[in-house]
Amino acid sequence: MSFQVRIIAPNGIIWDSEAEEIILSTNTGKIGVLTNHTSLLTGLDIGTIRIRALNNQWNTLALMSGFAVIKDNVATIIVSEAENGANIKSEEAQTQLEEAKSYFNTAKGTKNEVEANLAVKRAETRLKASQNL
């Protein structure tokens, strides 16, 4: 049995297909969703979503925060930004992570430290998505 997964970002629908299972990063940790999951509204952290398609292949996308609504075998995920891991080059993601860590190590002041921390988190998420983790 399967359920519908829709990922929507400001630039359009990023994903819209049936899935057997998803694993996503909420503000309180990772959760798994299967068919007939109880209704749920949750905030999403910067992190990956793993989608097991009907052919048992796993797809990983980088999500940059938002929220998810699970109801009646439909998972609607609305995020500020999303990127399919298959479209992310691992080498570029690794370089971005190294640059973000360098920025984090030299950041001065609360605002810069918070921005640097978020940059590291985004870069780590993109790298994980590129590696289908």
From Swiss-Prot:
Q: Which CDD domains match?
A: F1-ATPase_delta
Q: What protein name applies here? A: ATP synthase epsilon chain, chloroplastic
Q: How does it sit in the membrane?
A: Peripheral membrane protein
Disulphide bond pairs: none
How it assembles, according to the record, is: F-type ATPases have 2 components, CF(1) - the catalytic core - and CF(0) - the membrane proton channel. CF(1) has five subunits: alpha(3), beta(3), gamma(1), delta(1), epsilon(1). CF(0) has three main subunits: a, b and c.
A single GO molecular function term of this UniProt record: ATP binding
**Which keywords does the record carry?**
ATP synthesis, CF(1), Chloroplast, Hydrogen ion transport, Ion transport, Membrane, Plastid, Thylakoid, Transport
Q: Does the keyword Iron-sulfur apply?
A: no
Q: Look up the signal peptide feature and give its range.
A: none
- Task of the protein: Produces ATP from ADP in the presence of a proton gradient across the membrane.
Extract the HAMAP family matched here.
ATP_synth_epsil_bac
Q: Which InterPro entries match?
A: ATP_synth_F1_dsu/esu (IPR001469), ATP_synth_F1_dsu/esu_N (IPR020546), ATPsynth_dsu/esu_N (IPR036771)
List the Pfam families hit by this protein, alphabetically.
Answer: ATP-synt_DE_N (PF02823)
| Localisation | Plastid, Chloroplast thylakoid membrane
Give a GO cellular-component term: chloroplast thylakoid membrane
